[in-house]
Amino acid sequence: MGIFRRIFRQHDQTAGDLGYFGLHFVYQETIRLQYKWRQTFPDALDLAFAACHKQVQYATQAAEALQEAFPEQPLPAHFGFQRTASVLEQRKAYEQALEICQRAKEQGWAGNWAWRMLRIKKKLRERGYPVVSMSSSGMSQI
């Protein structure tokens, strides 16, 4: 687990060495591995969530780097956004989960963002929270 802690402490230096393209995939693998080990190591889930936060923090720069490297390809799935939205939804933090999904969709990351947002909006309605329109047409609700 030491390598992951060092990555979090030195993320600015790592970003300079790897670039946002490389850093995106370092955090993706960190999320994947730590989440896989969550039942084995007591701090694995916290480390996975910390990696999600870092990957989301650099999402815009990573998207630019990926689009520059592969201009003809759509952006891939973003583990940080996906896992963060899932964790927030599980914790019933629906407003924050909806915001994360919206950011991921706006940035163009692949994923089932529209479906996730509909599911979260339904849960908000069931809890009695108003779902307000974002557009003047009223067609897009949050």
Where are these regions (language model features)?
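Boundary/linker segments of alpha-helical solenoid repeat arrays
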Residues: 62-66, 106-117
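Alpha-helical solenoid repeat scaffolds, predominantly canonical TPR units
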Residues: 10, 44-47, 51, 93, ...
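Repeat-mediated protein-protein interaction surfaces in helical alpha-solenoids
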Residues: 2-15, 53-70
